[in-house]
Every structure is written in structure tokens, then in C-alpha cells.
């Protein structure tokens, strides 16, 4: 005969202990209680009778409710996307730009420290050019902060107006007694404490206007009369005004920006090829018809010839000597000999030669890599904007990259003897108020494009 199963004794509360492993109604297993807790519960069972059972039940209910609420909250929080750690804009681009600006401050001071020894600057202090350069940097920083706060849509809206303002500036600089001439070129408008160079404004204006034009005329990009010809006329007009200064270097940069943006905007391939051929033919004709430009080409081809070494090729020969003295690691910061009134414009057009002499091949290579990074990031930001269907922003960003790439390439080519001498500064590095100002504004516009890209990718609005 089978023995009866053992039935647990009832406690004073009238309740049985749940069986081991049985799930509690609030989702908690009874065996999760430690042995000491169970022992205390057995001894205090009688005390729980009557009024003691209700508080304990309420406490358990509250604990279970809190657990359920916590679980629900964790489920909801798990379904919610985590906060984005995306930066507001590309800080690597910002720091590379700051590095070039900082290098420019050091090298401008080094390259200009001996200039007061010449009769032309005898009244200047040793740090006069450094002080002016630092003031230009402060003004450029303030302008860049303001430009960064301007939405890209505003630049798009007022692009034609900015182009017209820059065009008027190119006309004003040619008016006698208004435009300031230096070394036979009339490129500056005196503004009291500083000089403004309208060609620098035109570089930014044509970058923005070319992007705006390409977007407005997108359906006519395959047409010669409606798509290609109006922009070609605008660039030709700008080129004519720049050549009257004369400023061939600025014209080459402006033409490169306009042609590059049109090409990236989808202009007809045959029309673009015709534009390139026309530009090359125009430059060739200008060189051939101008005796002094022709002499400069001959001097570039053979700078060590006795006829040119002390004349048209004087800057080039001393620039090459500076690079030769620098070798791999340079003669040391401040140790340049060519800047001691041997190399003209050492703090502006030929500052790379001073960098090569004092910091050597390694220093020049670092400068090249920094500019490469700016150009690369410009195109990446532009491509990202195009992927977000922001055609104007994308073309404008790439236009900034073309601007910096073309001007840096021409300046470096001139310093290294790869290109004929042109009056172009090295962006962000060379001494100059207008150049530094417009370079910083253009980088601020580029960072604004990147900022808006990131806002849109986070699901925001601009």
C-alpha cells in the first residue's frame, strides 16, 4: 500500500510556502531567496499573522511593480536610437587649417625679419610685418566665425550679387588715383590701415557663382548657347579685367575654379574640351603677344643663363638656391640666408623657398600633405552633400578644394621652378591681409557645408 504524500504544515497566516522552483506571480523565483532569508521567514511566520501579512504583500507588490516598470523602461530605451556621437563638423580640417596658419605666422616673421635693413623699409621695426599679419588673422577669424553662421541657402540666394560686387571691385581698382600700383601692377584698393585686393574676393565669388549657375542651368548643361556660353562670357570678362591689372596668376585660378565646377556639374564633354582648348590657346596668345611675358618664359626655361640670372630669373635662381641649401632637414628655423634681402618677396610669393631652406625637404613635404588633406576633405564633403541631394553645397565645397589646390600648386610650382613666375601667394601661409581673410572665409563656408550635412544625416533640419 502506497504511503500518503507529505503535505506541508500550514502556518498561522493560512498560506503554504510555494513549492521549490515554482514561479512567483511577480515573475521572481522563490528559490532565489537565500537560505538565511528562508530561515528567518520560518521563525517569523507566526508574527506575520493578521496585520503583518498585508504590509508584506503590499511591499512585494510594490517591488514587483518597480521591477516591471524598470523592465518596460529598459525595453523602451533599447528601442530608442542612442544619442549620436557625430561631431558638429570636421575638426581634422579645422586643425589642419590652424596648423597652416600657425606655420604662416612663424615663417612670415622669419622671412621678414631682415626687411627693415633695406632702404625701402628702413622705418619699419623687425616685427612690423608679424604684427600686421597677426592683426589680419584676428580680422579673418572674426569674419570666418560670422561666415560659418550663414546658412548655405543664403550663399546660394545672393551668389549673383556677390559676383557683381566682386566685378565692380575689379573695375574700381583700375581707376587712376584709386587703385594702388606696386611693381608695375595695379591690384590693390587702399582702405586706410590696409589694402584690399579685389581679385581675392573674385576667387570666392566665382566659386559660389559657378555652383549657383550650374544648379540654375542644370537642364541646359548640354547646350552651348544656354548653358556654356553665358558662363564662358562671365569668366572672359573677369579675365579681361584681371589681365588689365595685370594678374595672370589670379586669372588662371579663377578659370580653373569655373571650369572645374562646370565639369563636375555635368557640362557637355565636348564643350568642356573646347573650353580647355580655348583657355590654353588664349594663354599662349597672351604670352606670345606680350614681350615681357615672353621673356619670362625664356628665363623660366633657362634661369642660369647670364642674360636672365640677374634679371627676369633673379627670383627663381635665388629660390632654387634656397631649396638647395635646405637639403633634407633644413639649416634651422631662422637660419635662412636668402631671406637677407637676396630673395625678393620672401614673405609672400616665395615663402615656400624660405620654408625649404630652413625646414628642408621634410618641411616642404609636410606643407604639401597639409594642403592635400584640405583638398581631399573638400571633395569628400562635396560628395557627401551631393549624396544628400544638395547640389549647390556639393559643387561649392568642391570649388573651394579646386581653389586651394590650384593656387597652392601654382605657387609651389613657381617656387620649385616647375612653372613660370606668377604673383600668387601660398594660401593660409603667405603674408597678406586680403588673401588670409578670404582663405579663412572660404574654409568657414566649407565647414558650414559639412555641418549641415551632419545635421541632415542626424535627421535634423537646416
UniProtKB/Swiss-Prot annotation:
Pathway(s) served: Cell wall biogenesis; peptidoglycan biosynthesis
Residue ranges, annotated region (Disordered): 1-28
Periplasmic side: 114-127, 180-192, 245-247, 292-349, 420-425
Catalytic activity, reaction form: [GlcNAc-(1->4)-Mur2Ac(oyl-L-Ala-gamma-D-Glu-L-Lys-D-Ala-D-Ala)](n)-di-trans,octa-cis-undecaprenyl diphosphate + beta-D-GlcNAc-(1->4)-Mur2Ac(oyl-L-Ala-gamma-D-Glu-L-Lys-D-Ala-D-Ala)-di-trans,octa-cis-undecaprenyl diphosphate = [GlcNAc-(1->4)-Mur2Ac(oyl-L-Ala-gamma-D-Glu-L-Lys-D-Ala-D-Ala)](n+1)-di-trans,octa-cis-undecaprenyl diphosphate + di-trans,octa-cis-undecaprenyl diphosphate + H(+)
Main location per the UniProt record: membrane
Major enzyme class: transferase
Keywords associated with the record: Cell cycle, Cell division, Cell inner membrane, Cell membrane, Cell shape, Cell wall biogenesis/degradation, Glycosyltransferase, Membrane, Peptidoglycan synthesis, Transferase, Transmembrane, Transmembrane helix
Single annotated GO MF: peptidoglycan glycosyltransferase activity
Signal peptide positions (record): none
Record's compositionally biased regions (Basic residues): 13-27
Any one biological process term the GO annotation gives: regulation of cell shape
Membrane spanning residue stretches: 93-113, 128-148, 159-179, 193-215, 224-244, 248-268, 271-291, 350-370, 399-419, 426-446
Membrane topology per record: Multi-pass membrane protein
Listed InterPro entries: FtsW, FtsW/RodA
GO CC terms of this entry: cell division site; plasma membrane
Compartment(s) of residence: Cell inner membrane
Cytoplasmic side: 1-92, 149-158, 216-223, 269-270, 371-398, 447-462
Catalytic activity, EC: 2.4.99.28
Function: Peptidoglycan polymerase that is essential for cell division.
Family named by the database record: Belongs to the SEDS family. FtsW subfamily.
NCBIfam families linked: ftsW
Name of the molecule in the record: Probable peptidoglycan glycosyltransferase FtsW
Gene: ftsW
Amino acid at each position: 500500500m502506497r504511503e500518503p504524500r507529505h503535505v506541508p504544515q500550514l502556518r498561522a497566516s493560512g498560506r503554504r510556502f510555494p513549492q521549490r522552483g515554482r514561479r512567483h506571480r511577480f515573475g521572481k523565483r522563490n528559490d532565489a531567496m537565500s537560505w538565511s532569508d528562508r530561515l528567518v521567514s520560518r521563525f517569523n511566520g507566526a508574527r506575520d499573522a493578521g496585520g503583518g501579512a498585508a504590509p508584506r504583500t503590499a511591499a512585494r507588490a510594490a517591488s514587483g511593480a518597480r521591477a516591471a516598470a524598470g523592465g518596460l523602461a529598459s525595453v523602451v530605451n533599447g528601442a530608442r536610437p542612442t544619442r549620436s556621437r557625430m561631431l558638429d563638423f570636421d575638426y581634422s580640417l579645422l586643425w589642419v587649417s590652424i596648423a597652416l596658419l600657425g606655420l604662416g605666422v612663424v615663417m612670415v616673421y622669419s622671412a621678414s625679419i631682415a626687411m627693415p635693413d633695406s632702404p625701402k623699409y628702413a622705418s619699419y621695426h623687425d616685427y612690423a610685418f608679424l604684427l600686421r599679419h597677426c592683426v589680419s588673422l584676428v580680422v579673418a577669424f572674426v569674419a570666418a566665425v560670422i561666415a560659418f553662421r550663414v546658412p548655405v541657402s543664403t550663399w546660394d540666394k545672393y551668389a549673383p550679387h556677390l559676383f557683381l560686387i566682386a566685378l565692380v571691385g575689379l573695375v574700381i581698382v583700375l581707376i587712376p588715383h584709386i587703385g594702388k600700383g606696386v611693381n608695375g601692377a595695379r591690384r590693390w584698393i587702399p582702405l586706410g590701415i590696409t589694402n584690399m585686393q579685389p581679385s581675392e574676393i573674385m576667387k570666392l565669388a566665382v566659386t559660389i557663382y559657378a555652383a549657383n549657375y550650374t544648379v540654375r542651368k542644370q537642364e541646359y548643361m548640354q547646350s552651348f548657347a544656354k548653358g556654356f556660353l553665358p558662363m564662358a562670357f562671365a569668366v572672359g570678362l573677369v579675365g579681361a579685367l584681371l589681365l588689365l591689372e595685370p594678374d595672370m596668376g589670379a586669372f588662371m585660378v579663377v578659370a580653373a575654379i569655373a571650369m572645374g565646377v562646370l565639369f563636375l556639374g555635368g557640362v557637355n564633354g565636348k564643350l568642356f574640351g573646347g573650353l580647355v582648348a580655348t583657355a590654353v590657346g588664349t594663354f599662349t596668345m597672351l604670352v606670345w603677344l606680350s614681350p615681357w611675358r615672353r621673356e619670362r618664359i625664356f628665363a623660366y626655361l633657362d634661369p642660369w643663363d647670364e642674360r636672365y640670372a640677374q634679371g627676369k630669373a633673379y627670383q627663381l635662381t635665388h629660390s632654387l638656391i634656397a631649396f638647395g641649401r635646405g637639403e633634407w632637414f633644413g639649416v634651422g628655423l631662422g637660419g635662412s640666408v636668402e631671406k637677407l634681402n637676396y630673395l625678393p618677396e620672401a614673405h609672400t610669393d616665395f615663402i615656400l623657398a624660405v620654408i625649404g631652406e630652413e625646414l628642408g625637404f621634410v618641411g616642404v613635404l609636410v606643407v604639401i600633405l597639409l594642403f592635400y588633406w584640405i583638398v581631399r576633405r573638400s571633395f569628400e564633403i562635396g560628395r557627401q552633400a551631393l549624396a544628400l541631394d544638395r547640389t549647390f553645397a556639393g559643387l561649392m565645397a568642391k570649388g573651394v578644394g579646386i581653389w586651394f589646390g590650384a593656387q597652392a600648386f601654382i605657387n609651389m610650382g613657381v617656387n620649385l621652378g616647375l612653372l613660370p613666375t606668377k604673383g600668387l601667394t601660398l594660401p593660409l601661409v603667405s603674408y597678406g591681409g586680403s588673401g588670409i581673410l578670404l582663405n579663412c572665409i572660404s574654409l568657414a563656408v566649407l565647414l558650414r557645408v559639412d555641418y549641415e550635412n551632419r545635421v541632415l544625416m542626424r535627421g535634423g533640419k537646416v
